[in-house]
Swiss-Prot record:
Species name: Helicobacter pylori (strain ATCC 700392 / 26695) (Campylobacter pylori)
Protein's UniProt name: Glutamate-1-semialdehyde 2,1-aminomutase
Keywords tagged on the record: Cytoplasm, Isomerase, Porphyrin biosynthesis, Pyridoxal phosphate
Gene name, Swiss-Prot/TrEMBL: hemL
Enzyme class: isomerase
Keyword Cytoplasm: yes
Subunit structure: Homodimer.
Amino acid sequence: MELLHSINDFNEAKQVIAGGVNSPVRAFKSVKGTPPFILKGKGAYLYDVDNNHYIDFVQSWGPLIFGHADEEIEENIINALKKGTSFGAPTELETTLAKEIISCYEGLDKVRLVSSGTEATMSAIRLARAYSQKDDLIKFEGCYHGHSDSLLVKAGSGCATFGSPSSLGVPNDFSKHTLVARYNDLNSTEECFKKGNVGCVIIEPIAGNMGLVPAQKEFLLGLKALCEKYQAVLILDEVMSGFRASLSGSQEFYGVVPDLVTFGKVIGAGLPLACFGGRAEIMDLLSPIGSVYQAGTLSGNPLAVCAGLSALYKIKRDKTLYTRLDALAIRLTQGLQKSAQNYNIALETLNMGSMFGFFFNENAVHDFDDALKSDTEMFAKFHQKMLFKGVYLACSSFETGFICEPMTEEMIDLTIAKADESFDEIIKGV
């Protein structure tokens, strides 16, 4: 396999795009490689400008539960496009999508559509602070909630990948109201409550940006109880896990009903769409009813709404979808772990529905400190081997992988075989 055209494209991109990419992890810096420049995707496969094809376990970082260029979703988007790209005015489809989202999630009375996960979490926090009339926020080490200033404190994902605990350009005044607790640690969390005037707590119930690290059930239930004790608004960030791990996101596994929740990725089916929502008494503080301001030129744009609605309709029609995706994820993670064991390579794997992760680590990972103990050099070697064998994995050990509906057992078994070859070559120093 060669990447000559991609190398040339990347060099050209770096002349006019900061870093050559429009989101940092895409640069492949942590795996010491050159990112393939993608020409197209179809089903479970990506095709690059060098005529290589890959089994794609990234799926645009999660949105494409039905894979690339799904015919039904694609046709509906094209039909919507013929009517106009954006109106800046209400449409019936927005109401229909809102109803579909609300019907899947307990405790959700109303939603507001936005264009990105960052907008959703930023707006939810503003709303929660207004409702609680308290300024301080608790977040958790390794949880990533977008790149708004107050949340870039000990975030996972790109910040972890590049070894920076935060970001330059964020004034101390922006982050001084952000308290950071240890994931899956109630004692650490309550200490934060005691330190500040906490108005809200935001958490990924299934963390996907320090690798895949699910919350322990007793921790999430305890967190809900602490929020009630200290009269703080609980925000579940399900931008990644919503409609991915299950139809009801994390609620399938934990049964926790938050005050506010954020969704993204799957609800836009690959187009820019996210939302936040919750109890009516909180949501009604939003302008134009209340005095909490939030707005967006392209919020609820008809193309993204149409794509998301098409995906949700397909999901709800397919009664065995999540069962099949979960089975494939289990087949993959168990196969990878068995292969690594054959070569005495320490590897921890897990999945939550169609989300999966693996760490080159001796022990199970429960928090950010555990994740940071992973062998990132081994990950980089493995990633590069797999890429050149036609398997496209997330290019950071602090990211999550995804199964999509077009994938088959044969694709999974081929991936495991390629992993076996890769481990063999790594051990032999080839």
